[in-house]
Amino acid sequence: MAALLACCDPLTRTGRPDLAILTLLARLGLRAGEVAALRLDDIDWRRGEITVRGKGNRHDRLPLPADVGQRIVAYLHDGRPQAAQGRTVFVRAQAPYRPLTSNAVTTVVACAGRRAGLGLIGAHRLRHSAATAMLRSGGSLSEIGQTLRHARPLTTAIYAKVDVGALRQLARPWPGELA
């Protein structure tokens, strides 16, 4: 994930929105369509919360991590075109300043993946990465499911793939030959 974020230059017109988009996807596990639908009114800066308009016309509030908020602020102050109309957070960098679509968000991820040398990756892979990071930091499947806004626990279980590398560190080495 670090390589993906590092390939975005926060000092450029395209780097700031890309960095904000990738951070939202990677840290909160948002879907591409949820990032595209994000509106300025969905961010409650005082409470440190973000309202996500998800599948099934759901509206869920999530905590807004400091790093995510900082990247959004950097984009809003120095990246979002002044002439942009409407309340959508992410808009095209060049006129006409229309809201980004979910396909445009997916393209941001794909381009960043290529620049980072990761090959072709999609926005949904960052959702899986977010779930894995939550699991590694001690989050329960229930907590992860709530953050990812899964309707069924079984869906969350799919995201909790076995981390073979971590298991190797926990497992004892094979003692030797069979008797």
PLM feature segments, named:
Residues 1-179:
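Conserved catalytic core of the tyrosine transesterase superfamily
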